[in-house]
């Protein structure tokens, strides 16, 4: 594979929204599309399903919870393509509303994958993004709702334009710690681990976009978060009002923003419209 080849990559892509995004990119992106999944058998089965539709994604194993797995993927992309053109961070988890798992465990597990692991993917793959690259973090309006349900001093911190990545990581760690000590409500946090994890993803998006502006402005990389809406997936227990194809529309729109585009950047986008933060 020549390092001149363009490549797009989707995490958590063996089913649901990730699978629909991959299918759409296979149709619309001029270059290779890499479908990644934690489970190799499920990932390869998803690739075969798309091949049966006349599409030709590649497969690479990726467990975002495993830093070594992320680094192996980074090395593959560097060797095969000399970098990465499009990254869609879709992998994530959510507990059922009626799940009996104690809230502090739900908080730790949810933030580990949705926030900390997503951040690790960005840490390893952003440095190999090529000029005019596009990064899309799948977030949720649940994150915005969580922000609104935070105490005012916490809201101010999350909205602050000078909040650093280290500050944000400390805040996310504090939420997990506060749930363990059963003081999260007293400390001003909302009662949704998923919401806080997606709040973290959206604020991380704002911070990483700012970093790109400071360090690589000439490369015109655009990095955004988006809410796909309430989609009929396993995660939503098929309760959603949107199809996975509808859920994929905004992520794919952001992934394929034209090379001369300068915005959106560092935004939360739903239905192709920037949301007020």
Curated annotation (Swiss-Prot):
GO terms for molecular function: 3-beta-hydroxysteroid 3-dehydrogenase (NADP+) activity; carbonyl reductase (NADPH) activity; NADPH binding; NADPH dehydrogenase (quinone) activity. Its EC number is 1.1.1.184, 1.6.5.10. Keywords: Acetylation, Cytoplasm, NADP, Oxidoreductase, Phosphoprotein. GO terms for cellular component: cytosol; nucleoplasm. It comes from Mus musculus. The modification Phosphoserine is found at residue 30. One of its GO terms (biological process) is phylloquinone catabolic process. InterPro entries: CBR1-like, NAD(P)-bd_dom_sf, Sc_DH/Rdtase_CS, SDR_fam. Transmembrane segments: none annotated. Belongs to the short-chain dehydrogenases/reductases (SDR) family. This is Carbonyl reductase [NADPH] 3. The modification N-acetylserine is found at residue 2. The gene is Cbr3. Pfam families: adh_short. It is found in: Cytoplasm.
């Amino acid at each position: 594979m020549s390092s001149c080849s363009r490549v797009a990559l989707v995490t958590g892509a063996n089913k649901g929204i990730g699978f629909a995004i991959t299918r759409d990119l296979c149709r619309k992106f001029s270059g290779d599309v890499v479908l990644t999944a934690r489970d190799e058998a499920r990932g390869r089965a998803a690739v075969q399903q798309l091949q049966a539709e006349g599409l030709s994604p590649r497969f690479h194993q990726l467990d975002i919870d495993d830093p070594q797995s992320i680094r192996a993927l980074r090395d593959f992309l560097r060797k095969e393509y000399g970098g990465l053109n499009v990254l869609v961070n879709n992998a994530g988890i959510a507990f059922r509303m009626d799940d009996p798992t104690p809230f502090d465990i739900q908080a730790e597990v949810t933030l580990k994958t949705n926030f900390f692991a997503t951040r690790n993917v960005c840490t390893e793959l952003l440095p190999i993004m090529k000029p005019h690259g596009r990064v899309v973090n799948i977030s949720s309006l649940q994150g915005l709702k969580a922000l609104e349900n935070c105490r005012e001093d916490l809201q101010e911190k999350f909205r602050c334009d000078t909040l650093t990545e280290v500050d944000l990581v400390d805040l996310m760690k504090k939420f997990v710690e506060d749930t363990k000590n059963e003081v999260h409500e007293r400390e001003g946090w909302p009662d949704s681990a998923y919401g806080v994890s997606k709040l973290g993803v959206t604020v991380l998006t704002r911070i990483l976009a700012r970093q790109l502006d400071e360090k690589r402005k000439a490369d015109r990389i655009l990095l955004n978060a988006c809410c796909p809406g309430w989609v009929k997936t396993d995660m939503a227990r098929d309760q959603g009002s949107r199809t996975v194809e509808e859920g994929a529309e905004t992520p794919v729109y952001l992934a394929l923003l034209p090379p001369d585009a300068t915005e959106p950047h560092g935004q939360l986008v739903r239905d192709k419209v920037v949301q007020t933060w």
